[in-house]
Amino acid sequence: MNTLAEWVDLVCRELDIADAVSPAAMQSRVLDLSRDVAHNVARPAAPLTAYLLGLAAGRSTDPEATADRLAQQLCLLAQRWPDDQRESS
């Protein structure tokens, strides 16, 4: 197990959500979303967007499916973010 997987596993247990989430699916979903937001919008927007995704998914009766759907939606939104509004590097 690598450091990231160990950390995610520990955090899921600490937050008492280990039975409610698939760490592998969640990791891929959140990292893809974070990459798209950081690259296309602004680096600080990535963790904030991931947090907001978690809040929205947590309010759902099916958090995994909701997180998948919303992550895809937000990735597309970030990819369409206008060039002139992107943070300068």
Task: Report each predicted region and the residues it spans.
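An acidic intrinsically disordered interaction segment
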Residues: 1-28
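Amphipathic, hydrophobic secondary-structure cores in small proteins
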Residues: 21, 27-60
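Short, glycine- and charge-enriched coil/turn segments that flank and shape catalytic ligand pockets
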Residues: 16-21, 60-67
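Hydrophobic packing residues in well-ordered alpha-helices of helical domains and bundles
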Residues: 4, 30, 67-70
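C-terminal binding/interaction regions
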Residues: 12, 65-89
